[in-house]
Amino acid sequence: FDCTTKDLGDITIPDIMRVEDGSGFVRYLTNEELGVHNDKPVILMIDEYGKANPAVKNALLRLLLERKIGSYTLHPDSIVFATTNLGAEGVGDLLPAHARNRLTVIESSKPTWEQWIEWGINNGIDPTVLGWCRNNDKAFADFRDVEDPDENDYVYHPRSTRAAFVTPRSLEAASDWMKVRDKVNDN
């Protein structure tokens, strides 16, 4: 569930319910994309949570903490987690203090070049890309270990003006292009 493209209406919408005495109440319907309306277990990854607008963050925080969204409660066997970048990366990912205080934050690290090559061998990455990784191991450095962004042209660095950088995702995309390069028309 990509938070960067969602607003509150993509999470829940109100449904005004009437009862026999003329009174009413509001029930909130969830977006079917979430899958919680089926009363079956779901695995829900809330991607780019830190970039979501505040209303979306708050609605999804209830899902993360109380396992409820709109008028629905998640199936007890459901798994929900969120991803975001580090605030220090300077790409707009910020967790409000009230959310950060309630969530368990697990920081994952970039793979080493050895780990990525092992993964690549087992996942059909083009040998040319694997060789490039072996010869350019500094592409796997963490920006926090690079004091001067000009020392490493391959990694994202918040103090750099570079628009392009190497990530495991971009390496996998390069591999996909390498596999079809013979089929691409040069014209």
Which stretches of residues belong to each language-model region?
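AAA+ P-loop NTPase catalytic core and its hallmark functional loops
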Residues: 1-135
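Conserved AAA+ ATPase small/helical "lid" subdomain
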Residues: 120-187
